[in-house]
UniProtKB/Swiss-Prot annotation:
Pfam families assigned: Guanylate_kin, PDZ, WW
Annotated region described as Disordered, given as residue ranges: 210-277, 374-398, 941-975
Source organism per UniProt: Xenopus tropicalis
Protein name (Swiss-Prot/TrEMBL): Membrane-associated guanylate kinase, WW and PDZ domain-containing protein 3
Chief localization: membrane
Subcellular location: Cell membrane; Cell junction, Tight junction
Length: 1107
């Protein structure tokens, strides 16, 4: 009787997954873990406790099953000790992925490594993972000689052939073979690590977040070497498998009927109470590729699957891999929802739909809506002039593309790759090159042209990727590194490619008010964000206005807004931040006067100002508002930057918008009713849509409310009113995190964010602001900690390559804002569904008052020319107690034309002064030297929370009394009493009477090294400037200390103030200190004032012969 042919199954089909929860103690007490690389074995399961089934969710694994992964982390190749460490690292529930041992994969690690597999296969990848884990604890050996740059004992252990044979015969080598005539082998790792060896657990868990220097490189020689036993055994078929514990083959037969049971989610609970279509989520296709780098799949306590993006520290319900397989809405079946959509059944609002990707809500079913639009706008007939080209049909298969494929390699410059892209709004839309920027890398390469479809980036097919995903891929490539791209030529640009909304898409997106703009964003400046203009959400799209965490106004349809904005033509203004680089002859452009300010007259050398265009109006230079400066003043501001400085320039491009071209929110109800044509007369206005997912129904899994309360109670229970707390996650760049830390000089002094370094990580992120109070660093509260302790926490974060900051930001009231918010108070949500009172559009308040910086520069024989008034009584929460009481005619404050009586001052030189006393503020301004930066909120924008009647509107501003007279008390100003003081109205104080600054500065004591203290100075009285750190010597005491940075101002040297002293005197003070020097430093911005003097005359290293 002939035996029926059976289909051989890969061991992958036998992999099973289970969840371990409710243990309470050590999970290893429930399931014994045996094996380990030190024994030449995979980790595998040993004895099990009798009650193990009560703690397992899913199928209970058997004794002897090979352990492959723990919570998605591969443990093959780890030692027994490290495997236990990985298991104990995770909180419950713990997911275990195991496989029954067979002929290919079993306990024998040496056997598996000896097999040859096809490159790119599952087994080949698993072998590489095993080697990566082995190299954390062991070092491969070879009989060849060391090559240039290789370090014995680090890259390889270089041994003789005799030694190698001895190791092989003793069974110490897990794998061995020959490559290029030399022997290579991988020894077993020791059971216990070297006491000086780093703990590899974090590298195993978050491999991509560590520097490549700390990871052992994969050895090509070991991967490609010829092994003595490399024949691949056939895996046994399903029907031949032996019965376990007396069970028959029926179970196996059942497993065979259900494909890929190992890949199903465990447990199979409903993912949500809503009707979100998770059919594609519950079964994982074997052909589905692995999760993107630094992504992880996890379970909630209820067993629901969610995904963690370790790149951004965010979570989502959406499987990022399924985005590529998403169908267009019109192609979905009845009852099916497009990728990223969710159906909500709400008892008050009825049924509505949430688009988690675009973060919008609507009442219409998106599938039915798309099919209805498709029927109303059928495909053009053959006789239509604008016939759709045959080759424009979208595909995710590169082999199906119509056109010529081309390959190119571009080197990333400081301005990116030199081309802009468009598309990727929908899953079925190509991403195409829109423009090739002149003189950029793409233009110099000469291969890329507008319309080219981006097919592949560094080996990753991006057909079907979203615009944001591709932009992020380009952003992750470091400057001066290359990108390899495959493009397809033969597809026309879309018809709306000249749409101004679509035109602001760049490979390196423009930065608008600190936020990067991406495809589909509507670009508007702060001038448009006033009363009556549609508010834009955090992505620049029209939506619900949020003030102090509350929702006001309806959600407008994004597509309608896109159409209305696009109809405004090319005159739509846009604010764009362009990074400039100062060359030997300047920035490469000329400016001229215009009614709107200084505008670009011509481009002289575009390599220093790429992206700048003729006619651009300059708004800010390095975050300094220059709109009201004269032509000469703007030229002087640009001249102060040294050659090689990178300067962000904020420009206004395009003409001012016509009032008829900007969609307004009518304050008059009758106007509003008349402007909505779709509503019949007498029909009530529809209720505003519920919260979008980013406000009420988060697109991320929520923690248990009690858990959130417990975690936050200790830190935030004394949170002051009118403040908001936010978390900011930053990744470290080469220059650090991009901000300075102030405060912490005393136990009661708070820690604040100081200067935001231009083009640094914090500025690129855009969420952190100067004067934010620092609450936590990576979950560690900093209240009561010293400045040094905070720096130590930041140093530890720098070692990890990222930091999570919790900051507290003061919220300042605008006119009538509090009353409006009280009228529109929103009840709390019930059962996860939002509740929203019916409100009229006219009730939308203005945005919180916009603060702006004013930089004042004075001469030695004059003061800054303004008087600060401070409230004697403690004002209500949200009111800034310091305001301008007088501006002296002809003074720097008067000449700048930006300060007026009544303006509130919230910060000085980036340091919040809201909680400071008047004397401290005056001293802070005195110690600023000849330049001070004030953060101002205009008087008409800041009125504080209203209370009954506001007498400030009925009473004139108090006149400042002449010097020498009694300081009066004004009881009519905002109903508070104020005292007026002169702040720097007269000449600068002599050096002897100048007091050391205690707020915002920090002391640093250095011991002289063999070559001095390791820093150089610039400035002094003879150069009409203060003293600044110019350079830091490599391996010098200053750079080793870690607190001194280029651009920091020296306030004191050995307890002697530097106000008004010469450069020579500063050197003498340092010499007088002997082997030590004590410096009091004020954090700078990283830039050093340059008054066009020769650098050699402004700086000198402090060397031993000078001391």
């Amino acid at each position: 009787m002939s035996k029926t042919l059976k289909k051989k199954k890969h061991w992958l089909s036998k992999v099973q997954e289970c969840g371990l929860s409710g243990v309470g103690g050590d999970p290893c007490s429930l399931l014994e873990i045996r094996g380990g690389a030190e024994h030449g074995e995979f980790p595998y399961l040993g004895r099990q406790r009798e009650d193990v089934a009560s703690f397992i969710v899913g199928k209970v694994p058997s004794q002897g099953d090979v352990l492959l992964e723990v919570n998605g982390t591969p443990v093959s190749g780890l030692t027994h000790r490290d495997t236990l460490a990985v298991i104990r690292h995770f909180r419950e529930p713990i997911r275990l992925k195991t496989v029954k041992p067979g002929k290919v994969i079993n306990k024998d690690l040496r056997h598996y490594l000896s097999l040859q597999f096809q490159k790119g296969s599952i087994d080949h990848k698993l072998q590489q993972v095993i080697r990566d884990n082995l190299y954390l604890r062991t070092i491969p050996c070879t009989t060849r000689s060391p090559r240039d740059g290789e370090v014995p004992g680090v890259d390889y252990n270089f041994i003789s052939v005799e030694q190698f044979k001895a190791l092989e015969d003793s069974g110490v080598l897990l794998e061995s073979g020959t490559y290029d005539g030399n022997f290579y082998g991988t020894p077993k790792p020791p059971a216990e690590p070297n006491p000086f060896q780093a703990d590899p657990v974090d590298q195993v868990l978050f491999d991509g977040e560590f520097d490549t220097e700390t990871q052992r490189k994969r050895t090509t020689s070991v991967s490609k070497m010829q092994r003595t036993d490399s024949s691949l055994p056939e895996e046994e078929d399903e029907e031949e498998r032996e019965a376990v514990n007396g069970s028959s083959g029926s179970t196996d037969h059942r497993d065979r009927q259900e494909p890929s049971e190992w890949g199903k989610t465990v447990p199979s609970y409903n993912q949500t109470n809503s009707s979100m279509d998770f059919r594609n989520y519950l079964t994982r296709d074997e052909n589905l590729e692995p999760l993107p780098k630094n992504w992880e799949m996890a379970y909630t306590e209820a067993g629901m699957i969610y995904f963690i993006d370790h790149n951004t520290k965010t979570t989502t319900w959406l499987d990022p891999r399924l985005c590529k397989k998403a169908k267009a809405p019109e192609d979905c079946e009845d009852g099916e929802l497009p990728y990223g959509w969710e159906k909500i059944e709400d008892p008050q609002y009825g049924t509505y739909y949430v688009d988690h990707i675009n973060q919008k809500t609507q009442f219409d079913n998106p599938v039915l809506e798309a099919k209805r639009k498709k029927q109303l706008n059928p495909a053009p007939s053959e006789g239509t002039v604008h016939q759709e080209p045959e080759n424009s049909q979208f595909t995710r298969d590169p082999s199906q593309l119509k056109g010529a494929l081309l390959h190119t390699s571009l080197k990333k410059s400081a301005m990116g790759f030199g081309f802009t892209i468009i598309g990727g709004d929908r899953p079925d839309e190509f991403l195409q090159v829109k423009n090739v920027l002149k003189d950029g890398p793409a233009a110099q390469d000469g291969k890329i042209a507008p319309g080219d479809v981006i097919v592949d980036i560094n080996g990753t097919c991006v057909l079907g990727h979203t615009h944001a995903e591709v932009v992020q891929m380009f952003q992750l490539i470091p400057i001066n590194q290359y990108v390899n791209m495959t493009l397809c030529r033969g597809y026309p640009l879309p018809e709306d490619s000249d749409d101004p909304v679509a035109d602001i898409v760049n490979t390196v997106p423009p930065i608008i008010n600190g936020q990067m703009l991406t495809q589909g964003d509507i670009n508007m400046g702060s001038q448009e964000l006033k009363s009556g203009v549609i508010d834009l959400d955090q992505r620049g799209k029209p939506g619900l206005m949020v003030v102090n965490g509350r929702l006001n106004g309806p959600s407008l349809d994004i597509q309608d807004q896109r159409t209305s904005m696009a109809s405004s033509g090319n005159s739509l203004p846009e604010l764009v931040t362009i990074p400039l680089l100062k060359g030997p002859k300047g920035f490469g452009f000329a400016i001229a006067d215009s009614p709107m300010g200084q505008k670009v007259k011509m481009i002289l050398d575009s390599q220093w100002c790429p992206g700048l265009q003729k006619g651009d109006v300059i708004k800010e230079i390095c975050h300094q508002n220059v709109q009201n400066l004269t032509h000469i003043q703007v030229v002087e501001v640009l001249k102060q930057f040294p050659v090689g400085a990178e300067v962000p320039l904020l420009i206004l491009r395009g003409g001012p918008p016509s009032p008829s071209k900007v969609t307004k929110v009518k304050s008059d109800k009758q106007e509003l009713m008349g402007s909505i044509e779709a509503i019949a007369p007498g029909e009530p206005l529809p209720q505003p849509l519920p919260f979008p997912p980013n406000l009420a129904r988060s697109c991320s899994p929520k923690l248990d409310p009690s858990e959130v309360y417990k975690k936050s109670k200790n830190i935030f229970e004394d949170k002051p009113p009118n403040t908001k707390d936010l978390d900011v996650f930053l990744r470290k760049q080469e220059s650090g995190f991009g901000f300075r830390v102030l405060g912490g000089d005393g136990p009661d002094q708070a820690i604040y964010i100081g200067a935001i370094i231009p083009l640094g990580a914090a500025e690129k992120d855009g969420r952190l602001r100067a004067a934010d109070e620092l609450i936590c660093i990576d979950g560690v509260p900093v209240k009561g900690k010293s400045h040094k302790q905070v720096l130590d926490l930041m140093t530890n974060a720098a070692r990890n390559g990222h930091v999570l900051l919790t900051v507290r930001r003061q919220i300042y009231y605008t006119d009538k804002q509090q009353e409006e918010e009280e009228l529109q108070h929103t009840p709390p949500a019930h059962n996860g569904s939002p509740r929203l009172n019916r409100i009229e559009v006219s009730a939308i308040p203005k945005l919180p008052a916009e603060a702006y910086d004013v930089i004042l520069q004075r001469k030695d024989n004059e003061g800054f020319g303004f008087v600060i008034l401070t409230s004697k009584n403690k004002p209500p929460p949200g009111v800034i107690p310091h305001k301008i009481g007088r501006v002296i005619e002809g003074s720097p404050a008067d000449r700048c034309r930006k300060l007026k009586v009544g303006d509130r001052i919230s910060a000085v030189n980036g340091q919040s002064i809201v909680e400071l006393s008047h004397d401290n503020i005056v001293q802070l301004i005195k110690d600023a030297g000849n330049t001070v930066t004030l953060t101002v909120i205009a008087e008409e924008e800041h009125r504080g929370p209203p209370s009954g009647s506001n007498s400030a509107r009925q009473s004139p501003a108090p006149q400042h009394r002449p010097m020498g007279q009694t300081q009066p008390t004004y009881g009519t100003l905002d109903r508070y009493s104020w005292s007026d003081h002169k702040a720097d109205c007269g000449p600068a104080l002599p050096a002897g009477s100048w007091q050391a600054l205690s707020v915002g500065c920090y002391p640093v004591e250095l011991e002289r090294g063999p070559r001095g203290f390791g820093f150089s100075l610039r400035g002094g009285k003879e150069y009409n400037m203060g003293l600044f750190i110019l350079r830091l010597a490599e391996d010098g005491p200053a750079i080793k200390d870690g607190r001194i940075h280029v651009g920091d101002q020296i306030v004191e040297i050995n307890n002697e103030p530097t106000q008004g002293i010469t450069h020579t005197r500063a050197i003498e003070l340092i010499q007088a200190g002997g082997s030590k020097v004590l410096l009091l430093l004020r954090p700078g911005t990283g830039l050093i004032p340059d008054y066009s003097l020769a650098p050699s005359s402004l700086c000198s290293y402090v060397k031993p012969d000078q001391q």
